[in-house]
Structures are given as C-alpha cells and as structure tokens.
Amino acid sequence: EELNAIRDDKKEIESRFFAPLEFGTAGLRGEMALGCRRMNIHVIRHATQAFAEVIKAEGESACARGIAICFDCRVNSERFAHEAASVMAANGIHVRIFDALRPTPELSFAVKHYGTTAGLNITASHNPKEYNGYKVYWSDGAQLPPQHAAAIARNMERLDIFNDIQRMDFDDAVRQGLVEFMGAETDEAFLSNVLRQPIDPDVVRRVADRFKIVYTPFHGAGYRLVPEILRRLGYKHIICEPEQMKIDGDFPTVKNPNPEYKEGFTLAIELAKQNDVDLIIGTDPDSDRTGIVLKDKSGEYVTLSGNQVGVLLTDYIITAKKLTNTMPAHPAVLKSIVTTEMARAAAEKNGVECFDTFTGFKFLAEKIKQFEQDGSHEYIFAFEESYGYLCGDYARDKDAVTASMLIAEMAAYYRTQGKTLYDAMEEMYEKYGCYCEQTISIVMPGVSGLQRMKELMQELRDKPLTQIGTHKIDYTRDYMPGTRTCMADGKSEPMELKGQNVMYYELEGGTTFIIRPSGTEPKVKVYIMAKGANKAEAEAKVDVLAAAAKEIVK
C-alpha cells in the first residue's frame, strides 16, 4: 500500500531507491519508510546481518561475548531492536537487550560492564520524529572504529537484502537463552558509576532544602534515571514536566525534540514560573544531550548554548578538583574542532591542557583511549558544542545523566556563593574573554542535495577563498589531506588531524569559519566562532560572517 501510493511520484521513488543508506562510522540514520534509502525492518535486518559477519570474523569467543542492544522512545525503535536481536541470535551471537528504552550512555556502559564484543542502539537521537537510526559500538564502549564500519558497508554491498539474511523468532531466541534481558541490575550498576563522578557533593547538601530544578526528558529515555540521579545526589525538589514525562515517539508537545531549541522548553518554563525555579534541565530522546534554561538578571528565562554550558562545566570541574585536591598530575580537557575556543582559554589559564578532535564523540573517545594507553594525560572533561558532555571512565559516549548531575552540582556550588549559573556565565566572559558562536545548517535534501554538497566542498578546494565577508583569511586548514596553508605566502604545513571533509578558515582578529557536511543528516553545517573586546563586538563579527555564509553555501 505504501509503495502503491507513490508509484506515480518519480521524485519520491528516486529519493527512496536511488542508492542504499550509506553505512558510516555513525551507522545509519534516515526517515522511516519503505525503500533501501529509508529506515525499515528490511534495512535493519540487512545492516544487522552485515554487522553479524564482522563479529563472527572475530571468532567463537567474540560471538559468545555477544552484543548489547538498546533502543529509544521512537516509533518502531523497540521493533527494530527486536529484529536486530533476532538476526544476531540466528547467527549464533549472544544478545543482551534492554527490557525497555534506556539512555544511550547506558548502552556504552553495558558494553564495557558485561564485556560484550559490540553494541547496537536503535535511535535517531534529537532528529525529528520521522527519523530513526542504527548506531553501532565496539568492545571499548565507543562508536565503531572506521575499519569495522567499512567492513559492514562492504558486507551490505555483498549481501542480498532479502535472500542472505539469517533470522529467527525473537520469543524463540529468548526461550532458548540466545537473547537475555538487561534491566534493574544494569541500571543500578550504571547509576553507581555515575554517582562516582560528582566532585564536591557537599555543596548540594547545603542548598538541597530550598533549591528547585525542573526537568524534562522530551518524551524520551531520560525520564527515569535523570530524576533518580538528581535525588541520589541529594536534591529534594525535582519537578518533572508531566506531559513530557510521557514516553511518546511522536513528540506531541514539541516541533523538534532537541534541547538546543528554546521552543521545546515551553511547558517546562511555564512550570518553572509557577514554582519560582532558577534551573531547567532537558535531555533529548535518547538522553545523551543536555540543554539548560536559566533565569537572567531581569527574571526572563534564557537558554544557554552547548558551548556556554561546556565552558561553565570546564571551569567548574577544574575549580572543584583544585578545591578538593583531586586534580590528576597531567589533566586534559577535550573538545571538537568546531567547539568554542573559550574552553581552551578556560583550561589553559588554569594550567590544564586542551586537545582538539574531529566532530563526533567517537573521536573524543579515541583520544580518551589514547591517554589511557600512553599515560600521557588523564582527561577530566570532554564535550562538544552540540550539547554532549562526558567525564569518568565508565562509558565512551556523551551522557546526559552524568551531565545533568554535574550541572546540578555546579548550580549548587554557585548558589552557596549567592550566585546563579547566569551570573557565573557573565563571570566567564570577564575571566576568559568575550566569545560568540553560531552554527548555521543549510538543508540539501535528495539526490541533488548530495551532489551539491560534494560540489560545494570541491569548489572550496579548487577555488580557495581569500576572504569571508569583510574578514581576510590568514590560514586555511583542509582536514582531508591534513594541511594548514598560509594565505600570505602559500606555504603549507602538515597537521596531526586529517581524513575528514572539513574546511577551516582562520580569519584576522582570531575569528574562525568552518564548513563541513553533516555526518547524519542531508545538510551542510557552518560554524562561526568569534572573539571581541566585548560581547557586542563578538556578536557583530558573527553577524557579518553569518550573512557571508549564506552566500558561500547555496
């Protein structure tokens, strides 16, 4: 019926069938519908058979250690997870699957905790309701390394989507012990690890009687564990937004279930006003990203960006570790190349090194693993501008459960000093300088969109920009070959990071302009990062470059 409805729509047919969804290091993500370029049970089975071949190639013990499977609140997520389990079990791979939706970081934890060979999460994170995804992990709890992702992609090309799939009935697999459920016991193990991350929980006890927090899970997986961890931290007044505590993959109360947008917090803000609350915390549907809303000096509720929250946490974690004498000998803060340079200023001014990685938490996880292996540094905090934060060694993906807890601890610390988090953010600008950032997403859907993205990135290499808006370019970094070129003399030098389709422009006056195609959606992203003598100057620089971005990316 679904395909019959589009039989006369050539553009829709082409969009759904012109090529399969590409399996990348982030797995698969797409709109739910029939077609090889959409998310549906056939694509799930196909990807899972290809994944199973990679696990089987590791040997019998890898199959016995098996795979941990998780899913979020989205329409079809549980069904897709059970389908994946059925294919894995039929391939002789032991499956541990959660008995209901869980936060993404708990899957990363479960892989490490149970020593499984791999992990799989059915989620589209903060994307609109039409989307679902297939996110893959390896034995270290981090997202799949490139060589394994490439092997899965090759297997998908080789295997027929219908005839080469091994699967069995899910209930039969459970009865035979090939599939076992994870539940409360795993939750407790996860929460006990999260509870090791607070730096100075005493500050919470000092304010717990009067400090109120409003929480919303955006209809998703944080609904149980985030309020629970805040209570265990010592908070007594956690007010959960009742409508958004209802699990619903249609996200009926928001246009977009993304804590980046203030619109999603409308109900939570109303609740906060009724209860005179200073802090609102929101987590996305798979509970790996965290957004906050604060009262400003005039009593208005305002959102903070992922960059701002990351800087606040960087500064707080360093301050608290120094106060409690828990700072390691060689501490490091990690961030992605598109994340604010204010974090570097906050780290380095306090004697902590700051390292950059490519965009995506898998790259931050690789750096954490490198530090563990070579002993050169111990990371104390890792974050991205896209609202993802992590500390500790229990997981290898961004964690909204721990982030919510640390934000709440930080808020308590400032309350003991008679300050709000808004006051603290104002102090950050005084301490580290006035930074301003903006991310612009330009959607390029369908076949023509993919082609345009390729053409755009090639044009930027073939005809190098010399200025953007009114700003002259000092250096151009091309992260594909890993070269940094001085525009004055044309000389290039190699960079440590390479192999990603990113163009990075260092402009006069310390401003940055970055262009990259999204790894998960049909869009090009432009990141603008500016520093000024004051906030107005920094914002003006961003405005000029934002206007220029729309001319460059069209």
Model-identified regions with their sequence ranges:
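Short Gly/Thr/Asp-enriched flexible loops that form oxyanion-binding sites at enzyme active sites
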Residues: 80-88, 131-138, 288-307, 343
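Gly/Ser/Thr-enriched, mixed-charge loops and adjacent short helices
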Residues: 12-21, 132-266, 272
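N-terminal small/polar loop signature for handling phosphorylated ligands or for N-terminal nucleophile
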Residues: 68-131, 236-291
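Phosphate-binding and adjacent anionic-ligand microenvironments
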Residues: 273, 277-279, 300-302, 320-516, ...
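Glycine-rich phosphate-binding loop plus the immediately following alpha-helix
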Residues: 137-167, 307-330, 335-345, 400, ...
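Conserved phosphate/anionic-ligand binding catalytic regions in large, soluble enzymes, centered on
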Residues: 17-37, 124-127, 213, 217-225, ...
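An N-terminal, well-structured beta->alpha segment
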Residues: 1-84, 173-174, 179-210, 221
